[in-house]
């Protein structure tokens, strides 16, 4: 499936094949992206996309569901095995839907939820005012400390003062380990439920390189792509039977109708891959590579938020390090075939579409067995330090940009996208 497609619809064919070319020729550093196996792609393009079946395995509202029942049940069983949980729902179309259903399962209408602010690395669905979580619930936030790390004492003070119904931990731009035990202690002190959104770190947990929230969080949500390297979608897990029943009702019929069986098949295959011994090595390499990458920038005097990383991502303050914006960094690096994303950083004074920071992740390129992290850091650092020159129209600048791009292209030839894991 990692090949050019031939379709009757030439417009869509061109877009898909152009995207395949882009993925093949670009260094992918967006922390939420990865390369799935050929098997996952095949499953998602299978005849399962034709089948409808509301409800859950072996209790559907439609007939002839025996084959999709098998697929969904094996996905459930594998996810339960990976995370060592008693209950799993693999139907959510996305992480956001999973969060919506999970929150509704443990928080009353209009109840109070408490999550990390966007600038500190939280997610829209953790209480941001324009998200469902900030519209239908009374949301409050906590922040990271001046050092860029979670301040558990400050979080406890806020929780005791505000008495939320739910505390959310697990983030989209936080580079350090999360102490789920401390969060549960805080939740118990203020009478709150604890939800862990492990969308970014699920693969690291599966590989044993990040602590698990199981045994601490009342309910756990995740996506199945990112470090999990599977089909795009969401899942919800818990060990609480009553919460499990509510989750099932909120997923269907609460938020969704028929499941996307082709996507669930892609999830099932990714879970199979995550159960193989090689996945542990993959997870270990993600973190090892992120630490090497981070240290390479630190050695060059670059401000890495929190002073480093414990997981798959790092945040760089490009405003203080290079006197540029995240938007400017993202736009230029794309010219030399490096994909990153601008990202707000703690205490950011710039708007979200501009930002003072960038976010870099190692999950995707680790899937390609990429090893030139220090050299890549050198290219990025040089580019951002010399942005004014490189964006000029001089022949010297054009030649240098071409040279940088060719170096990146050589990386992509040396480390191609793999089809099997």
From Swiss-Prot:
Pathway: One-carbon metabolism; tetrahydrofolate interconversion; Amino-acid biosynthesis; glycine biosynthesis; glycine from L-serine: step 1/1. The lineage of its organism: Bacteria, Bacillati, Mycoplasmatota, Mycoplasmoidales, Metamycoplasmataceae. Its cofactor is pyridoxal 5'-phosphate. Its main location: cytoplasm. This is Serine hydroxymethyltransferase. It comes from Mycoplasmopsis synoviae (strain 53) (Mycoplasma synoviae). It catalyses: (6R)-5,10-methylene-5,6,7,8-tetrahydrofolate + glycine + H2O = (6S)-5,6,7,8-tetrahydrofolate + L-serine. The modification N6-(pyridoxal phosphate)lysine is found at residue 226. NCBIfam families: PRK00011.1.
